[in-house]
Amino acid sequence: MMALPAFAAEYGEPDITPQTTMGEIRSNPSILGAGVWTYSKEQNLPGTEDWCNDQTLEKYVSSHVAQDCADGLNLLIRNYNAGVQITYKLYSEQEIAEDSSRNNVEFYYYPASTPDAKYALVLSGNIFNRTAELKECISTAYQLHQKGYAVFVMRYRAYPDNDNNSPMEDIARAVKYITGHAQQFGVQTE
């Protein structure tokens, strides 16, 4: 019998199913290490943690996308465990110091299986008052990955807490970043 490497305890298992609770997902070491946001804005309010964490993934995201969402999270875990950087901040520390609302602007990277792939930037929510990366993007990211795309799941600023152009600035920043790092991500720029 082979012993596990010493670092194995630092990684989570890619064993998420639609019946896994949100608390179990949020405590998975690889989800934590990857830095993926697993809340919707309205569900990260003080006093709602237990209610949210006790829900199954299926109840949280809905039954029609739960399996693809679980598969997408498991893919993310496998990528993270293999040393792939998942989360990319889109603003520098100086830019965040100038405007703290930029701190949460980031994307989550799902590399394609082959180099020089097309890519998709997946957005969630309604830009006005919420984003919902887990509920609306992870399943889509998985489906697109299965079709050969590199996928970037975007977390952007919503309007109520920011000026009217903030979401558009964030999306433009993401496209510019991906294009500028196309070779690193193994994606086509057109």
Task: Explain the meaning of each model-derived region.
Residues 126, 155-159:
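Short beta-to-alpha linker loops that shape the active-site pocket of alpha/beta-hydrolase fold enzymes
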Residues 127-130, 151, 177:
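Serine-hydrolase catalytic-loop signature spanning alpha/beta hydrolases and amidase-signature enzymes
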Residues 117-126:
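Short beta-strand element of the alpha/beta-hydrolase
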